[in-house]
Amino acid sequence: MSVMFDPDTAIYPFPPKPTPLSIDEKAYYREKIKRLLKERNAVMVAHYYTDPEIQQLAEETGGCISDSLEMARFGAKHPASTLLVAGVRFMGETAKILSPEKTILMPTLQVECSLDLGCPVEEFNAFYDAHPDRTVVVYANTSAAVKARADWVVTSSIAVELIDHLDSLGEKIIWAPDKHLGRYVQKQTGGDILCWQGACIVHDEFKTQALTRLQEEYPDAAILVHPESPQAIVDMADAVGSTSQLIAAAKALPHQRLIVATDRGIFYKMQQAVPDKELLEAPTAGEGATCRSCAHCPWMAMNDLQAIAEALEQEGSNHEVHVDERLRERALVPLNRMLDFAATLRG
């Protein structure tokens, strides 16, 4: 595997944490959101990494809690005229690309993703142009502009299957932006992959030594790992997979104690799936090290109840997602390829 462009994730400024709400304030905003969703003919689409109270509200209002692939499917098929996307910006853009006729709202448009930030379109275009013989596969965690230059978009839930398919056709791959997921896929498939060097600030922080000590403390625990984690962490796993695949693994494994190496937002749905099992966070700091994300995406944390209520009430430029139509049409092609390929896997 060849590598290039190594963005420094340490330079990304973290957003300020939302001001904590009182119990009464939370109750007020919950009821307000429920009312506004009905008035606006809107539905919530929330990612597994949002805070538990956001996921709970999506459940209670007939919305969706899922990984980015299922979020895309759900939003495109749901009859609501407005989608409230609780996640990060590329998820809102993806919803708009797939459903241009719908109003796409987000609690704030400043919800970034370190993978997206680490793959600026100008640098990506230069890399793309330097390797015209390669099929371009980009992770869903990219901007609409980067998706528009791709042949395929992929999520972690189908990454191995797609690259295995393309490799069987003799295609050489450009992979962007996550280096850890790219290396995992390359190891699983043996594909010829030229890999961008981005990383998720959450998964990149998991520490091998600290995880080993936790494993020694709980030798009966299984380790579940998202493939955006470093290879040394992946090598310790009893199960590796996307968010939805990790929840399925938690149910399938016989272990009563699980160490989970992904954003702790997943614990809400995972604990529902395995109410009798104990879930432990994989450590993100160790031996003189400190964590920046501490196993929770700081941009996902910006999706709070007050911001959601304001998005539904105010609309406008601070909350509504727009994608240039020409860009949208180009990005739609690889997104539809992803959805069609995923449909063949589901049978």
Curated annotation (Swiss-Prot):
Reactions catalysed: iminosuccinate + dihydroxyacetone phosphate = quinolinate + phosphate + 2 H2O + H(+)
| Organism for this UniProt entry | Shigella flexneri
This protein's GO CC annotations: cytosol
Q: What does this protein do?
A: Catalyzes the condensation of iminoaspartate with dihydroxyacetone phosphate to form quinolinate.
Q: Which gene encodes it?
A: nadA
Q: Name one Pfam family in it.
A: NadA
Q: Which named protein is this?
A: Quinolinate synthase
| The keyword Transcription appears for this protein | no
Taxonomic classification, please?
A: Bacteria, Pseudomonadati, Pseudomonadota, Gammaproteobacteria, Enterobacterales
* Required cofactor(s): [4Fe-4S] cluster
PANTHER family according to UniProt:
QUINOLINATE SYNTHASE, CHLOROPLASTIC (PTHR30573:SF0), QUINOLINATE SYNTHETASE A (PTHR30573)
What EC numbers are recorded for this enzyme? 2.5.1.72
